[in-house]
């Protein structure tokens, strides 16, 4: 991706969405274009028009943290957008300023045992939306994603390439928008992650829905929320989710799902857990039978 174009488009789209009244500019209502003028952003940020024009052209080299924070306040950026602006500035700096990303690695047995010990649905994905681990009920919950040949175990591919995703996720539009915003956040954090860039290129090439959302330059921290799922075995589920980081493995994120106590979703989730346990027990019995026969 063209880093300068990323910076320029991000700042321009943030500037265009702000009305003069939101920025405290009164009395000037005749505008040919939406949003603030560059000179208004510069004045509110406390920098020269020339300096801001350079920044909006995509040149963040040497821009101080103080200026970035002031610019974030002027543009009314939220936490995710402010972090994204700092990530873009970090990527523009010398190599020593960039945070190293860990090399790809296998999911440790110790973490898999931890995941398996959790009673609620849990799955772990990386920055490229690949599912790298899950417990039995987590695999049962996301079976349509994991088993879909178009997805290849990747939630972004499932959403944008598989027609089944629109049934599985009743709130498909929100899910699609969230995935794109999360991918753009990760792209800002890891601009030289080739696998991530390749995935984004694949999605942009094959999906109009992805391209439209990618052009919006929205970013998001995917931490907590509500997920509605229409599961083929147990029906409709309304689940709260929480995302957790692995400090020793910053490329992975664990998601746990729970239902409100006494709700229909809790009952259906309990049924899904029973079905997952029966499937796991059956698989073990089959494996034990094969071992006995081989012996």
For every predicted segment, state its role.
Residues 1-12, 63-105, 127:
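Short amphipathic recognition helices of helix-turn-helix/homeodomain-type DNA-binding modules
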Residues 12-19, 86, 90, 116, ...:
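Amphipathic, well-packed alpha-helical segments that form the structural scaffold of globular domains
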Residues 22-36, 95-110, 114-117:
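An N-terminal domain-cap segment
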Residues 109-121, 125-126, 131-295:
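Hydrophobic protein-protein interaction segments
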């Amino acid at each position: 991706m063209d880093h300068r174009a990323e910076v320029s488009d991000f700042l321009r789209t943030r500037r265009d969405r702000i009305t003069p009244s939101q920025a405290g500019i009164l009395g000037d209502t005749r505008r040919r274009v939406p949003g603030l003028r560059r000179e208004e952003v510069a004045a509110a940020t406390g920098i020269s028009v020339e300096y801001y024009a350079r920044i909006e052209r995509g040149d963040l080299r040497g821009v101080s943290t103080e200026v970035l924070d002031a610019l974030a306040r002027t543009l009314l950026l939220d936490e995710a957008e402010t972090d994204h602006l700092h990530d873009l500035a970090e990527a523009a700096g010398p190599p020593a300023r960039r945070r190293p990303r860990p090399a790809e690695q296998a999911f440790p047995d110790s973490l898999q045992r931890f995941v398996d010990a959790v009673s609620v649905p849990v799955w772990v994905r990386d920055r490229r939306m690949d599912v790298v681990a899950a417990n039995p009920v987590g695999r049962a919950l996301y079976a349509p994603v994991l088993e879909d040949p178009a997805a290849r175990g990747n939630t972004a591919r499932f959403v944008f390439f598989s027609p089944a995703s629109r049934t599985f996720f009743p709130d498909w539009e929100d899910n699609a928008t969230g995935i794109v915003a999360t991918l753009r956040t990760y792209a800002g954090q890891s601009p030289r992650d080739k696998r991530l860039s390749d995935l984004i290129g694949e999605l942009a090439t094959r999906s109009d829905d992805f391209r439209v959302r990618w052009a919006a330059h929205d970013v998001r921290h995917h931490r907590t929320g509500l997920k509605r799922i229409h599961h083929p075995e147990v029906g409709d589920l309304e689940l709260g989710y929480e995302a957790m980081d692995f400090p020793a493995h910053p490329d992975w994120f664990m998601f746990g799902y729970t239902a409100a106590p006494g709700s229909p979703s809790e009952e259906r989730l309990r049924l899904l857990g029973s079905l997952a346990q029966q499937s796991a027990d059956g698989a073990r019995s089959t494996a034990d039978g094969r071992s006995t026969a081989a012996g």
